């Protein structure tokens, strides 16, 4: 199997990964944010290669985790706009043997629930701690850690179930008396585009999931520029648009112009865009008209999201700076749309497949508008713009529903939709789509300067 995280398009054959159950694959990554929506690091969701189940990387999968995921190149992609990465796994001695291949100072190990502290695990934790690694554990599943002061002193973060946080506050305070630097991270069992409100997140140091943006309120109707962006979205999807008219719109919005300039100029993004899947290059080595149309759609979404964010701050009379922008919802939209695009290229016909990226991107229209789904799609009904959102929606509609359910961790529901639509979900391909989409999204964010100061690959 090819190493899907190699960012320069090369492949490395991994002859010893013929057993899917021993492979470690990235199912998802979730931002860990503060109450203002600033992402401090990402938490990986890992899966064995033979299943869509996710969670901790088991001991037998750690060799694959360190070889395939914890490389310098893949860590940089997975870290995205942050510097650090949280990895749910067990502290085997292999982490020490492979420490030169990654930087322990930028890794937070989320220790397995109710972990049994073997001599191997204790020694590894203590030695990794000296190298700068940080550790996290669930407060309701500390196992032997709670009674081992030496290991407890290595813990930097405590995870707590949001719904049960009140009942654990006494325990948390007791642990903080022993270890004052402990930070509390709240989590929910359900994942959505926005997992926490600002009010919910204020009671914790961090939350696992995206904090909602300020919603924009309207006195009578939306600003003219929002209507113009929504109309442009619809025109781009339909492919019925005047290039000169689009050019005028881009010229009138500096953010759109900067976005297009950055994306078109990025050789790395071009390379990732023209790749038909995660391991091979397409025959064409240049961007197609559909690729450029997708770039235009991204520039529309970026402009709409950023200007609306600015106006929402102004409405609340809060000083605004681009440094305050919580881009995570926009990043989620990019990543989701690209996975839809990659899956559609393998499944849909040549007429439908080119529509896939924008169709998936439009699923996040309410995010760009800083509005509720109900209000947005009542005014901007997706089924009126894209046929894949009508009843049934064909293969593309099924792909979007399946991937949205997988994104929300509703695995059984996703499998039911796939079976009813006659689609076979090949695990190896899906994990390939995910890894390719993350690398591509990272390249887009760099081109848009959402990831600051990153050099062209």
Regions inferred by a protein language model and the residue ranges of each:
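A generic secondary-structure signal
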Residues: 68, 72-77, 127, 174-175, ...
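Generic recognition of flexible, low-complexity loop/linker segments
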Residues: 75-76, 147, 246
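Conserved alpha-helical "signature site"
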Residues: 187-457
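The catalytic core of metal-dependent phosphodiesterases that act on cyclic dinucleotides
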Residues: 101-213, 352-355
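Bacterial c-di-GMP phosphodiesterase EAL domain
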Residues: 4-106, 113-119, 328, 332, ...
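Short loop/turn motifs at secondary-structure junctions
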Residues: 38, 82, 153-154, 200-203, ...
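Short phosphate-engaging motifs
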Residues: 95, 167, 256
């Amino acid at each position: 199997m090819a190493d899907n995280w190699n960012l320069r398009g090369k492949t490395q054959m991994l002859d010893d990964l013929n057993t899917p159950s021993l492979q470690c694959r990235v199912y998802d990554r979730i931002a860990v944010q503060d109450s203002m929506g600033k992402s401090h690091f990402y938490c990986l969701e890992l899966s064995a290669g033979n299943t869509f189940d996710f969670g901790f990387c088991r001991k037998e999968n750690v060799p694959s985790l360190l070889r395939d995921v914890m490389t310098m190149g893949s860590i940089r992609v997975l870290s995205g706009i942050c510097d650090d990465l949280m990895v749910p796994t067990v502290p085997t001695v292999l982490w020490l043997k492979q420490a030169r291949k990654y930087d322990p100072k930028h890794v937070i190990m989320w220790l397995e629930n109710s972990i049994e502290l073997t001599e191997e695990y204790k020694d590894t934790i203590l030695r990794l701690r000296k190298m700068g690694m940080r550790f996290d554990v669930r407060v309701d599943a500390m196992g032997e850690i709670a009674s081992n002061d030496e290991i407890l002193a290595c813990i930097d973060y405590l995870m707590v179930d949001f719904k049960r946080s009140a009942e654990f506050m006494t325990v948390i305070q007791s642990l903080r008396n022993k270890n004052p630097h402990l930070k509390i991270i709240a989590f929910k069992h359900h994942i959505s585009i926005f997992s926490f409100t600002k009010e919910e997140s204020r009671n914790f140091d961090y939350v696992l999931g995206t904090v909602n943006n300020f919603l924009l309120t309207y006195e009578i109707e939306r600003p003219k520029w929002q209507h113009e962006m929504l109309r442009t979205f619809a025109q781009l999807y339909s492919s019925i648009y005047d290039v000169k008219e689009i050019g005028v719109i881009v010229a009138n919005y500096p953010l759109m112009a900067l976005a297009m300039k950055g994306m078109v100029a990025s050789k790395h993004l071009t390379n990732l865009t023209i790749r038909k899947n995660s391991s091979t290059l397409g025959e064409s080595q240049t961007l197609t008209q559909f690729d450029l149309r997708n770039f235009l759609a991204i520039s529309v979404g970026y402009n709409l999201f950023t200007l609306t964010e600015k106006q929402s701050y102004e409405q609340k009379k809060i000083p605004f700076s681009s440094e305050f922008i919580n881009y995570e919802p926009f990043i989620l939209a990019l990543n989701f749309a690209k996975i839809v695009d990659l899956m559609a290229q393998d499944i849909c016909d040549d007429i439908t497949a080119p529509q896939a990226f924008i169709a998936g991107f439009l699923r996040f229209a309410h995010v760009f508008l800083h509005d509720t789904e109900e209000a947005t799609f009542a005014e901007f009904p997706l089924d009126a713009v894209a046929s894949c959102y009508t009843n049934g929606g064909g293969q593309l509609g099924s792909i979007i529903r399946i991937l949205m359910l997988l994104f929300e961790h509703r695995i059984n529901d996703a499998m039911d939709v796939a079976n009813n639509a006659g689609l076979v979900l090949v695990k190896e391909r899906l994990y390939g789509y995910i890894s390719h989409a993350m690398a591509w999204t990272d390249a887009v964010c760099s081109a848009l300067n959402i990831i600051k100061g990153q050099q062209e690959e």
